[in-house]
Design a protein with these regions (language model features):
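Low-complexity, Gly/Ser/Thr/Pro-rich intrinsically disordered linker/tail segments
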Residues: 176-227
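Sec-dependent signal peptide recognition
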Residues: 2-8
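Active-site-adjacent structural segments surrounding the nucleophilic cysteine of cysteine proteases
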Residues: 4, 16-85, 90, 204-208, ...
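Conserved active-site-adjacent core of cysteine acyl-enzyme catalytic domains
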Residues: 22-42, 83-192
Length: 227
């Protein structure tokens, strides 16, 4: 099984953009098993809707929120078309969708949503996902907060798929401190789903050693004749 795991891991990393496929994994001479492989890139977009346009992260974020966090399936194009039709089209073309556009769209589907200035821990307590605006590399971008636990924030990013980051890193990107949440239909909300977290597991070494903890560890300086 170690051989199968090693081969599978190599294929997973080596083909990040490849679709799901079946490969034959040999576990012993003359014995092989078909294994379905899914690339990391494909897995990250399994529960996050990928945005089609540079300015459509808002429609992709709301499609992610409804489809995967509230069980109300809708594709990005449908959300985009409806919000664009009822919004300020000139402004949308320059700046993308606003939270007001998203609020109106959600209301048309029976969801009551508003923005709140509350700490991230409140989402964990209430068990509800949220849309937030982050500023990454100079670009404003809507993402869905799918989970938060043990100092890690799980995001449904329409541009990069489901990914996790430290709370410190998230706070640096989340400059306006506003969470946009649906406050009815609470029984339908999905937050901290194991299926979502499975795509972005913490690295084992990161759990055991803090980066700063490596500072005192140095290689000894060897002298002549030392091995």
């Amino acid at each position: 099984m170690k051989i199968a795991y090693a081969v599978g891991l190599a294929l997973l990393v080596a083909a990040p953009a490849a679709p799901a496929m079946k490969v034959e994994v040999q576990t012993s001479p003359g014995t092989s098993y078909p294994v379905k492989m899914t690339s990391l890139k494909e897995a990250r977009f399994r529960n996050t809707v990928r945005q089609k346009y540079d300015f459509s992260c808002g429609s992709a974020a709301v499609a992610t929120l409804l489809t995967y966090q509230y069980g109300d399936p809708i594709d990005e194009q449908s959300a985009f078309d409806i919000m664009y039709e009822h919004g300020d089209q000139a402004k949308i073309g320059k700046e993308g969708f606003s939270l007001l556009d998203i609020k109106r769209f959600l209301a048309s589907r029976g969801f009551q949503a508003d923005g709140f200035d509350v700490p991230l821990e409140r989402l964990e307590v209430e068990g509800v996902p949220a849309i937030v605006l982050i500023n990454e590399r100079g670009y404003h971008h809507f993402v869905v907060v799918k989970g938060y636990k043990k100092g890690r924030v799980l995001l449904g990013d329409p541009a990069r798929g489901t990914r996790a980051m430290s709370r410190r890193r998230f706070d640096a990107l989340w400059t306006n401190r506003i969470v946009f949440v649906i406050h009815n239909e609470r029984d339908r909300a999905i937050f901290n789903s194991p299926r979502d977290w499975a795509v972005a597991p913490a690295a084992p070494i990161a759990e055991g050693i803090e980066r700063n903890g490596l500072g005192p560890i140095v290689m000894p300086k060897r002298g002549p004749g030392d091995i």
